[in-house]
A protein has these predicted regions:
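Conserved active-site alpha-helix within GNAT-family acetyltransferase domains
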Residues: 99, 123-156, 161
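Short hydrophobic/aromatic beta-strand or adjacent loop that forms the aromatic wall/cage
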Residues: 49, 161-167
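Acyl-donor (CoA/ACP) binding surface of acyl/acetyltransferases
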Residues: 151, 163, 171-173
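A short, internal acetyl-CoA/4′-phosphopantetheine-binding micro-motif in the GNAT/acyltransferase core
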Residues: 86-93, 121-123
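Acetyl-CoA-dependent GNAT
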Residues: 8, 15-19, 23-85, 89-90, ...
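Conserved G/P- and acidic residue-centered "switch" motifs that form tight phosphate/ATP-binding loops
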Residues: 96
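Basic/polar N-terminal segments that are highly enriched at the extreme N-terminus
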Residues: 1-6
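Conserved GNAT acetyl-CoA-binding A-motif
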Residues: 109-122
Length: 173
């Protein structure tokens, strides 16, 4: 089911999307191969993930996925679905697309859970996401910093990259 406004369409990904999506990110110098999106589609068919795509005025603008069983153990143990891989192309930012994608993912999550989870990176590239999640009512899950979904022990040294995250939750039901 697609959410339609005058200029924005949020819909589930389909098999025609992976090449377009990959090309859009490749043009920015980001490595997001079509195989990743094809995996998302396979997981959708298996009932494990919902990949939502945003089109702004008919042009690919971004996407987000909802994983029904999180790779992060505390979410999986509590049956908290996880929103992951929120990406809005830079030319389409600050138009409400990220929030619309989150609205759609949270709405889907609310059909199965009263809580949804999300992870956010720790360095400045994630600054906009950090602010959006706080404004939307997400709070840390209390488990501390994670690296590749594993707790970072006090005194440990890690690389602050895309694998370092703070996990957050929000009521949705």
């Amino acid at each position: 089911m697609a959410l339609v406004t005058v200029q924005l369409v949020i819909r589930l990904m389909d098999e025609s999307d992976p090449e377009t999506m990959s090309a859009a990110f490749t043009a920015l110098g980001w490595h997001k191969p079509p195989e990743m999106y094809q995996r998302y589609l396979a997981e959708q068919e298996e009932g494990r993930r919902l990949p939502f795509l945003a089109e702004w005025r008919g042009e690919f603008a971004g996407y987000v996925t909802l994983q029904w069983v999180s790779d992060y153990r505390p979410f999986a143990e509590r049956q908290i679905p996880e929103i992951s891989d929120l990406n809005v192309l830079p030319p389409h930012r600050r138009q409400g697309i990220g929030n619309a994608l989150l609205d759609r993912a949270e709405s889907a999550a609310s059909a199965r859970s009263k809580v949804v989870g999300i992870g956010v990176g720790l360095y400045s590239d994630y600054g906009a996401a950090q602010r959006i999640y706080v404004r939307r009512g997400y709070l840390p899950d209390g488990q501390g910093i994670m690296y590749r979904n594993q707790p970072v022990e006090p005194g440990a040294t890690i690389t602050i990259d895309d694998e370092a995250a703070l996990m957050l939750t929000r009521p949705v039901g």
